[in-house]
Regions:
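A substrate-engagement module of RecA-like helicase motors
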Residues: 4-113, 117-121, 166
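Residue-level marker for buried hydrophobic side chains located in beta-strands
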Residues: 9, 140-141
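Hydrophobic "anchor" residues on beta-strands that sit immediately upstream
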Residues: 112, 139-140
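Residues immediately C-terminal
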Residues: 120, 147-150
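Short, conserved loop/helix-junction motifs that constitute active-site signature segments
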Residues: 130-137
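Walker B catalytic acidic pair
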Residues: 144
Length: 169
């Protein structure tokens, strides 16, 4: 709190939960696999209130497409999912909003948030410009720093197999 705003980055959901429980001011960000996809639920005619059933059927945000390319007037157009809210716009209680993005946006706009390594690296590598005003926090604390190297390699590493090398000899 001393610095005014921060990111805390940790390796596991259990640590995120522990931090969030102990430090109530932290807003956690969980991955897409932890949330039911409203779009897929809609397609399967599952009530929005029945997220437990959707999760049991594997209808997670990880599997739903947030952006699709469609044809309009002979041109390819990218369309966002109707449930994906826009960051910075006031919350509309009359409209269903994606649970994953709601919690992610709450964390981005909160002074202090807690992320897992994969989500944090994803944010900083691919979405830094899109969320520029929200990611310029003065401090990032990496818990379990002894795992940082492994986490970076897991995020951006390349697997090289002997079969591929044999082809070039």
């Amino acid at each position: 709190r001393y610095f005014g705003s921060s990111f805390i980055v940790t390796a596991s959901k259990q640590l995120q939960d522990q931090y969030s429980k102990d430090l109530k001011f932290l807003m956690p960000v969980k991955g897409k696999s932890n949330f039911a996809c409203l779009k897929l639920m809609d397609q399967e005619s599952i009530l929005k209130s029945n997220t437990k059933s959707a999760m049991q059927k594997g209808l997670t945000c990880e599997k739903g497409l947030c952006e699709e390319t469609t044809m309009k007037n002979g041109k390819k157009v990218k369309e966002s999912c109707q449930f994906k809210p826009k960051l910075g716009e006031p919350h509309d209680d009359t409209k269903d909003s994606c649970y994953y993005y709601e919690q992610k946006y709450r964390a981005l706009t909160s002074p202090h948030s807690i992320w897992n390594y994969a989500a944090y690296f994803q944010l900083m590598k691919f979405n830094r410009k899109a969320y520029a005003e929200y990611v310029s926090k003065p401090i990032a604390i990496f818990d379990e720093a002894d795992n940082v190297e492994d986490q970076i390699i897991q995020f951006s590493g390349v697997d090289i197999y002997n079969e591929y090398l044999a082809e070039y000899n």
